């Protein structure tokens, strides 16, 4: 049960990201909001790649300024994984390996960062990346990470959605529907309305395929 790396695709609008960083806004908030723009309002793959490459650079710059800020590490991992999905090609596996290292560092130092988002992100990599000998994909590790994410954030939209997606790909339809239904009822994130809207569309799509 391995997905092509293209399923990890996401994008960002670099022009607006640049102005947001320049304005003195919290880089974490900017990254989160612009990621939602990339993921759900992207116009084409080339734009995804260009914008995400530049966002990664700015994420790295922000992390240099605050090297102990684990939230920025989580999002750097998410952005690298997203670029791997958007670009594919020979560099994709290197990007997801870099993302894996970042997420493992967060889990080791501050596992509850962003409500356990490192577990959710690492779990999704484990079931989407090809397994040995190509990559590090591992369904058992995927389920372990995703269930840990749910222990930390049992009502969150993302951990419930990604665990449901994993279950669906594993052929566990009934369980997947249960977690998708729970994801639909997740409390809204006041600072991330676009991300919530886009995720709910993905939830509805997967539910439609399973029912």
Describe every region a protein language model picked out.
Residues 6-16:
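Bacterial N-terminal signal peptides
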Residues 31, 36-45, 82-91, 114, ...:
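Short coil/turn linking the two alpha-helices of tandem helical-hairpin repeats
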Residues 17-58:
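N-terminal leader/linker segments that initiate helical-solenoid repeat arrays
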Residues 44-60, 92-101, 135-143, 179:
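Helix-turn-helix repeat elements of alpha-solenoid scaffolds
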Residues 72, 115-118, 159, 193:
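TPR alpha-solenoid repeat register
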Residues 67, 111-113, 154:
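Short coil turns that delineate tetratricopeptide repeat
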Residues 57-64, 107-108, 147-151, 185:
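Conserved structural position within tetratricopeptide repeats
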């Amino acid at each position: 049960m391995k997905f092509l790396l293209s399923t990890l695709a996401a994008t960002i609008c670099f022009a607006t990201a640049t102005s947001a960083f320049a304005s003195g806004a919290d880089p974490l908030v900017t990254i989160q909001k612009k990621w939602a723009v990339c993921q759900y309002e992207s116009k084409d793959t080339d734009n995804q790649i260009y914008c995400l490459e530049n966002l990664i650079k700015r994420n790295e710059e922000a992390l240099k300024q605050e090297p102990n800020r684990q939230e920025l590490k989580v999002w750097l991992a998410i952005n690298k994984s997203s670029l791997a999905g958007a670009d594919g090609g020979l560099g994709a596996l290197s990007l997801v390996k870099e993302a894996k290292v970042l997420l493992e560092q967060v889990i080791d130092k501050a596992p509850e960062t962003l409500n356990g988002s490192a577990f959710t992100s690492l779990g999704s990599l484990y079931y989407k990346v090809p397994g040995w000998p190509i990559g590090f994909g591992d369904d058992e590790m995927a389920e372990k990470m995703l269930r840990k994410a749910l222990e930390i954030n049992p009502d969150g939209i993302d951990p419930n959605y990604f665990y449901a997606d994993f279950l669906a790909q594993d052929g566990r339809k009934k369980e997947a529907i249960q977690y998708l239904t729970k994801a639909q009822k997740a409390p809204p994130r006041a600072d991330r309305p676009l991300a919530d809207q886009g995720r709910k569309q993905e939830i509805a799509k997967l539910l439609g395929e399973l029912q």
